[in-house]
A protein has these predicted regions:
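Solenoid-like repeat scaffolds
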Residues: 27-32, 55-64, 91-95
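TPR/TPR-like (Sel1-like) alpha-helical repeat modules
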Residues: 62, 78-97
Length: 113
């Protein structure tokens, strides 16, 4: 695991447990998000319908993973020009497909990489 990923998977000085995409989806049935990186927590809140909380979590985060989630959130909001800015920051192409498909692709990438 590279240093950037290592930092992204730490919380309060403890290494986070790995989680697979299916377990992440199952966690949506719980009241609190799992102990995952900030970008993944933002996606968790977004899936639960709390766009504002998701945006609060990711807006002050650095790095391409956070930028990708930030782009997705602005796409959900319908602010495509702002989303485009964040896709560029993430070095990702602007998504054109269904929002649910993009959410799943981001989750898969962030949990597997």
């Amino acid at each position: 695991m590279d240093a950037t990923r290592e930092l992204a998977t730490r919380r309060r000085g403890r290494r986070l447990k790995p989680m697979d995409p299916a377990a992440f989806r199952t966690s949506l049935d719980t009241a609190k998000p799992p102990k995952v990186s900030a970008p993944l927590r933002a996606l968790w809140h977004a899936a639960k319908g709390d766009w504002n909380r998701a945006h609060e979590i990711v807006q002050d985060e650095d790095g391409p993973e956070a930028a990708w989630v930030h782009a997705y959130l602005h796409r959900v909001e319908g602010d495509l020009s702002n989303a485009g800015y964040w896709y560029r920051r993430a070095a990702k192409p602007v998504a054109k497909g269904e929002l649910q498909e993009e959410w799943a692709a981001i989750v898969e990438t962030l949990l597997v990489d």
